[in-house]
Amino acid sequence: AQQSDIRTMKLYNFFRSGTSHRLRIALYLKGLQTQYVPVDLRTEAHLKDEFKAVNPQMLVPALEVDGKVLIQSPAIIEWLEETHPTPALLPTGANERAQVRALAALVGCDIHPINNRRILEYLRKQLGADEAAINTWCATWITAGFDAYEALLAANPLRSRFSFGDSPTVADVY
């Protein structure tokens, strides 16, 4: 990574956040270094005015680059791919890119949100769900998501060492 990357990129993240993990993985695969700024969700640091000024959505991760803040891990990963194209995290063909994006979306939209901290807190506090009900609910939807992911992998002749080919893609990042 260039020295300027270290000074100009600041990643607001939480060490146990899946969306923060995917962004750290993408940054690592791209060979980019960034300043890490911890946002402790356990102490509700993301709800404080200081972080709200960074990201009005009050979610991690957020990536500050040259004073501008990018939010939402899918958008940030796309930005990384566009601004730092090598190594590529998307294949070259349009059909292959769509397949990789579909795998990533399956995790990002159908699996990960089910086990998201704020969703689980809503189930507990607003709906009064007990842990057994929450665990059953999570297991049902997460299993369905991973079953679909595995079926897509099994049907893909390009599957190799990674989800799609011989090098990591956005699908593996998620």
Give short role names for the model-derived ranges.
Residues S4-T136, A154:
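GST-like domain detector, emphasizing the conserved glutathione-binding G-site
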Residues R22, Q99, W141-A144, Y174:
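Charged catalytic carboxylate motif
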Residues T86, A151-F164:
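Surface-exposed helix-capping loop/turn segments at secondary-structure junctions
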Residues I114-R118, F162-Y174:
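GST superfamily/GST-like fold recognition
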Residues N135-A155:
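Amphipathic alpha-helical packing segments from all-alpha helical-bundle domains
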